[in-house]
């Protein structure tokens, strides 16, 4: 027994003296899976003890008692073990150990617990691309692009990859690392022009390890950034040169026309009769006169110069035809009644200057001027005013007593109540005819006058003065001397009268219409049957159309009263105007039946 123990100690001492020992303890370096389907484990062997040593990898799965040896020691290289899909399971924990054995003994590494899900280390990104670009502000940058690893399934979402890039200039020692997240492209700014840069990329899954750095690529940043396609600049330059040549040629040939088109001349005044000197001097009144514009009429404060309207009784039974017609209408023709409420231009009455303007200028008048019947009685009618012939002007005044009056212009205090019709502007239009009408007298009385009413009798009085003819070339011819013993009446009353003028007080002065044979009726002895006329209308030639009244009453009394009127004393020129103005409305009225009529010849003499 003691001899056997001594033998063993002798052998051991001899082995130690020769340098042989059991193998050292191996160490598992790492286990990695590129795609969660396969994985590989690497280890570092210990000392071999001077003897040949065998290494083996054994594993077991958690929850299982069986131990398995590595299926493939060659695929991944020496000191490694490759697990194919057949031997790889996810959501399982592997317990892995490495054993070393030689003639002197054996040794075992520490166990390593591996979960395939957390040991993924993908391949580096592929297809790395570098490009230098320029922004609109001429600032350059480096554009880096790459693709995910080929083995990993990124499109289906089996992996979620994150990326990093690193770059440095060729002369630098340290790398500049940029994390890009899940993007596969990145822009690097603030690069130094004229230097060469080195770029690399890598990736890692959401749970795992960073891949190794990929292939290294380099690029040089140019000093002056220029476009690669220089043909674009060449084309632009050629087109610009052609356009410039065309413009120079056009200006050389048609320089004046082009300058006129670009800078047109200032047009001058094209108004006929327009005086530029008046415009430059700034005299607006002379300029308006040159253009034919009327200046503003002067204002007048004399209210008594305006005549409100003319009122003449209208015969509702009979009507004469216009002056150009020589026949009277038939019995079936009815007179046209006027609407008493129609507007007659009352605004003309309110104008202070309309009367003078319209009485001075000849104007075109309406074909007819109808005047409605006014039957309102004055408050203070004048009566029994004897005629006062003026020897200087040979102007008679007639008077007839009546209970009704027709509105005529009076002084401001003697105006009677008037109907709100008939503006004086319309009356002045009738009075604005040329002066050559002074040569006209009473036209030939129409033979086919409507029959007078038998009830009117044959004793109507004509309180009218005969008028002698005026020369056509003189307007201001005096009237013949008047007879002082009584009024002179016509053998046959006149049918037409013509407006002579309108005096400053707005009173109409009438003349008898001249006959066709240029002869006037001479005054003669009144016949047994007399007729008085009333205004029926106004023709185109401003002639009043008169119609005899068939309802004249009490003509005998009127004739007697007219004959008994004594002549008044001689008046001077200023008193004559006032007397003719105030006494016209009462002295020239005749009451025939229940209507009033005016004697045109009386006004003709009084306002001449």
Curated annotation (Swiss-Prot):
Which branch of life, at top level?
Answer: Eukaryota
Signal sequence interval, chain numbering? 1-19
Query: Bias regions of kind Polar residues — which residues?
Result: 398-408
Q: How does it sit in the membrane?
A: Single-pass type I membrane protein
> Which PANTHER family does the protein's record reference?
CYTOKINE RECEPTOR, PROLACTIN RECEPTOR
The identity of this protein, by name, is Prolactin receptor
Q: What does this protein do?
A: This is a receptor for the anterior pituitary hormone prolactin.
Q: Main location per UniProt?
A: membrane
Task: State the species of origin.
Answer: Mus musculus (Mouse)
Assembly and oligomerization: Interacts with SMARCA1. Interacts with NEK3 and VAV2 and this interaction is prolactin-dependent.
* Any one GO BP annotation for this protein: response to bacterium
Where does the record place the region Disordered? 317-355, 377-419, 466-487
- Compartments, record wording: Membrane
Q: Enumerate the Pfam families for this protein.
A: EpoR_lig-bind
Record motif WSXWS motif, residues: 210-214
GO CC terms of this entry:
cell surface; membrane
Domain notes for this protein:
The WSXWS motif appears to be necessary for proper protein folding and thereby efficient intracellular transport and cell-surface receptor binding. The box 1 motif is required for JAK interaction and/or activation.
Query: Cross-referenced PROSITE patterns, in alphabetical order?
Result: FN3 (PS50853), HEMATOPO_REC_L_F1 (PS01352)
The UniProt keyword set, sorted, is: Disulfide bond, Glycoprotein, Membrane, Metal-binding, Receptor, Repeat, Signal, Transmembrane, Transmembrane helix, Zinc
Q: Glycosylated residues? A: 54, 99, 127
Gene, per the UniProt record? Prlr
């Amino acid at each position: 027994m003691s001899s056997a123990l001594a033998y063993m100690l002798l052998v051991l001492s001899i082995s130690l003296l020769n340098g042989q020992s059991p193998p050292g303890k191996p160490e598992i370096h790492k286990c990695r899976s590129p795609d969660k389907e396969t994985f590989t484990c690497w280890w570092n062997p210990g000392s071999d003890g001077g003897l040949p040593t065998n290494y083996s990898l054994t594993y077991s799965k958690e929850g299982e008692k069986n131990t398995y040896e590595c299926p493939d020691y060659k695929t991944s290289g020496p000191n490694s073990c490759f697990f194919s899909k057949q031997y790889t399971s996810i959501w399982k924990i592997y317990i892995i150990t490495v054993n070393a054995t030689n003639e002197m003994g054996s040794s075992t590494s520490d166990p390593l617990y591996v979960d395939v899900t957390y040991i993924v280390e993908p391949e580096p990104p592929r297809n790395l691309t570098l490009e230098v670009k320029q922004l609109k502000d001429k600032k350059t940058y480096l554009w880096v692009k790459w693709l995910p690893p080929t083995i990993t399934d990124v499109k289906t979402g089996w992996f979620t990859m994150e990326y990093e890039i690193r770059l440095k200039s060729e002369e630098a020692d340290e790398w500049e690392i940029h994390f890009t997240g899940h993007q596969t492209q990145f822009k690097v700014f603030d690069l130094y022009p004229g230097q060469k840069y080195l770029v690399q990329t890598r990736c890692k899954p959401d749970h795992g390890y960073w891949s190794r750095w990929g292939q290294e690529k380099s690029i040089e940043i140019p000093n002056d950034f220029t476009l690669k396609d220089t043909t674009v600049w060449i084309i632009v330059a050629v087109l610009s040169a052609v356009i410039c040549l065309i413009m120079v040629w056009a200006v050389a040939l048609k320089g004046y026309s082009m300058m006129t088109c670009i800078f047109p001349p200032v047009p001058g005044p094209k108004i006929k009769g327009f005086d530029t000197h008046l415009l430059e001097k700034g005299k607006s009144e002379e300029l308006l006169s040159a253009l034919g514009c009327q200046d503003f009429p002067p204002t007048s404060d004399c209210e008594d110069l305006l005549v409100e309207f003319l009122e003449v009784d209208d015969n509702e039974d009979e009507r004469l035809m216009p002056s150009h017609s020589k026949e009277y209408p038939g019995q079936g023709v009815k007179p046209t009644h006027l609407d008493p409420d129609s507007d007659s231009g009352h605004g003309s009455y309110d104008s202070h200057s309309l009367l003078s303007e319209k009485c001075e200028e000849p104007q075109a008048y309406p074909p007819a001027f109808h005047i409605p019947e006014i039957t309102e009685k004055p408050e203070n009618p004048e009566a029994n005013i004897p005629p006062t012939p003026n020897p200087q002007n040979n102007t008679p005044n007639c008077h007839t007593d009546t209970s009704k009056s027709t509105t005529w212009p009076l002084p401001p205090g003697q105006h009677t109540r008037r109907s709100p019709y008939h503006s004086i502007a319309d009356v002045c239009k009738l009075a604005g005819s040329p002066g050559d009408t002074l040569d006209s007298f009473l036209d030939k009385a129409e033979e086919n006058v409507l029959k007078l009413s038998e009830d009117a009798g044959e004793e109507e009085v004509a309180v009218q003065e005969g008028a002698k003819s005026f020369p056509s070339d003189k307007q201001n011819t005096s009237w013949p001397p008047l007879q002082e013993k009584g009024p002179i009446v016509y053998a046959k009353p006149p049918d037409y009268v013509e407006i002579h003028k309108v005096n400053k007080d707005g009173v109409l002065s009438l003349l008898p219409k001249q006959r066709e044979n240029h002869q006037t009726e001479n005054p003669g002895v009144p016949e047994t049957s007399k007729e008085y006329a009333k205004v029926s209308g106004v023709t185109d030639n401003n002639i009043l159309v008169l119609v005899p009244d068939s309802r004249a009453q009490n003509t005998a009394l009127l004739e007697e009263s007219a004959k008994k009127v004594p002549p008044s004393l001689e008046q001077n020129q200023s008193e004559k105007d006032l007397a003719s103005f105030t006494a016209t409305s009462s002295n020239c009225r005749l009451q025939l039946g229940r209507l009033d009529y005016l004697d045109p010849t009386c006004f003709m003499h009084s306002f001449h």
